Design a protein with these regions (language model features):
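Short hydrophobic beta-strand element within catalytic cores of glycosyltransferases
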Residues: 316-319
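N-terminal subdomain of nucleotide-sugar transferases
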Residues: 1-47, 51, 55-58, 376, ...
């Protein structure tokens, strides 16, 4: 059974990032499986209106005011008219929102429930409980997820965090990790030329590292506080002082870029640290293969897709032991450090020593990562969630027990709840003494706007768009796939048929 799905998030291409890549790869693989998928995001500079991407993936760039880090200004209700128009035009059945800090995501889930649509939310981040910003974010998340069909988290640590923040039943939260297109992140081969002539004097690809050969440490990250840029600034001078044959390549942009440049000038390290600035996602592999070690000093991370990409490129990973990072890669691919300056320096020095002593063999990293992570598998598991919330799977099959064995309130929030306004208000009313009443007021106003739109612009008067020609759904085991979901067997059959036709005419 195929579904019509709308992915909604503030964060999407052309902005690079893990959430953006996740949405794109998941959408294209769901299209390969026979579903219709559209993406709703805000307008970017040079990207407005409706755009088509690979495989007929349609992207709606909604003109909304951006306030901070590509997040739109939260208006609660003003998004409803254009959202309703898109949903009706595309005949959407499931609305899938991404990101706790995405205003479009939260508003889309609320409006979708008012329209009687099934909703799914994917959380990609970890947040605390103490500071004012986290408290407000968690309250907003609890508001939105009080009436959602299912929640997906990218790691078990992220699941625990989301369950606590939004007061959810753990049974209605699934863990589906991110993945990588392994074919796009291959190690540098012997026959492949060096990416940069500057690297030729440092180390040729696959060459044994001697005591005086230079080891290159790669860092690819947004230069923000939560990405551990302050730790990086403190650790680089100490690492360079302790290891004279070590250089750094830093790719990324952000408000901390000025601090990094000041550190380089203060310590006269311009000849040993190369700043590349922002790089496109398709250029990430070309940067990674220039090094032997990948350093990831993040202070908080739900999954860390970039370290999977680095391991796939054959780099040994040094990362902080925070959030869901310990779940991502096996121990022989990583060295963990506490999010402290001394520990970062010690862990990096340990990795350098292991590389020089030949105790780390990275030749098989790519094949191992390809076996562990696949977007095809992620799409299959996400499709199972869609089947569960739409009723195609029984509760016993989807949740793991017979109806009536679990908490009844959770069952009411886990995909079988009523769309009736009174039932929705009961769920929102339990969000707090004052917050519950405020949330109920917002939902009542939202429902009144929906009724007004139904009268003012009836559904029958909205033109239905023609669908992009769909592919035949690809089932598991039908053909050999690589990490990007490319089918090879089908192309082989087409070539054989073409050869048979040519022989027949000859």
């Amino acid at each position: 059974m195929s579904y019509r799905i709308a992915m909604v998030c503030d964060f999407f291409f052309p902005q690079p990032g893990g959430v953006e890549s996740h949405i794109y790869q998941l959408s294209t693989n769901l299209i390969d499986r026979g579903h219709k998928v559209i993406i709703i995001t805000h307008a970017y500079e040079g990207r407005t209106g409706v755009r088509y991407l690979t495989n007929g993936l349609k992207v709606y760039h909604v003109p909304f005011f951006v306030i901070y880090r590509e997040t739109t200004f939260p208006t609660v209700f003003s998004f409803f008219p254009i959202f309703r128009n898109i949903i009706i035009r595309e005949q959407i059945e499931i609305v899938h929102g991404h990101g706790s800090l995405s205003s479009l995501c939260h508003e889309a889930i609320i409006h979708a429930r008012s329209m009687g649509l099934r909703t799914v939310f994917t959380d990609h981040s970890l947040y605390g409980f103490a500071d004012a910003g986290s408290i407000l974010t968690n309250k907003l998340l609890k508001f939105t997820l009080s009436d959602v069909d299912h929640v997906i988290c990218v790691s078990h640590t992220c699941k625990e965090n989301t369950v606590l923040r939004a007061s959810l039943d753990p049974l209605m939260v699934s863990v589906i990790p991110n993945a990588v297109v392994a074919e796009n992140f291959r190690p540098l081969t012997q026959t492949e030329p060096l990416i940069s002539p500057h690297d030729a004097k440092w180390l040729a690809p696959n060459q044994t590292i001697g005591p005086h050969d230079t080891i290159t440490i790669v860092v690819i990250s947004r230069l923000f506080y939560n990405k551990g840029t302050d730790l990086l600034i403190a650790a680089i001078p100490r690492i360079c002082a302790a290891h004279p044959h070590v250089r750094f390549i830093i790719a990324g942009s952000g408000p901390k870029a000025i601090d990094v440049e000041q550190m380089l000038e203060r310590n006269v390290l311009q000849d040993r640290v190369e700043m590349l600035g922002p790089v496109r996602h398709e250029e990430v592999r070309d940067v990674m293969v220039r090094g032997q070690i990948y350093l990831h000093p993040s202070l908080t991370e739900a999954f860390g897709t970039v370290i999977v990409e680095a391991a796939s490129c054959g780099l040994y990973v040094v990362c902080t032991q925070v959030g869901g990072i310990p779940e991502v890669l096996p121990p022989h691919m990583t060295t963990f450090a506490k999010p402290e300056e001394d520990d970062i320096v010690a862990a990096t020095s340990k990795a350098i020593s292991l590389m020089r002593n030949g105790k780390i063999q990275t030749a098989n990293f790519h094949d191992q990562v390809r076996m562990m992570y696949s977007w095809t598998d992620v799409a299959e598991r996400t499709e199972r969630v869609y089947k569960g919330i739409s009723g195609s799977l029984s509760e016993e099959e989807f949740y793991g027990y017979s109806p009536g064995e679990g908490w009844s309130a959770a069952r009411g929030r886990a995909g079988v709840q009523s769309f009736a306004l009174i039932d929705r208000l009961k769920r929102y009313y339990g969000c707090g003494i004052w917050a519950g009443k405020l949330f109920c007021l917002c939902i009542v106003i939202d429902y009144l706007i929906f009724v007004f739109l139904e009268l003012w612009a009836p559904k029958a008067g909205v033109d239905i768009v023609r669908d992009w020609p769909r592919k035949k759904p690809i089932t598991t085991g039908e053909a050999h796939r690589d990490g990007g979901g490319i089918t090879r067997k089908k192309n082989k059959r087409r070539r054989e048929k073409r050869w048979e036709d040519l022989d027949r005419h000859a």
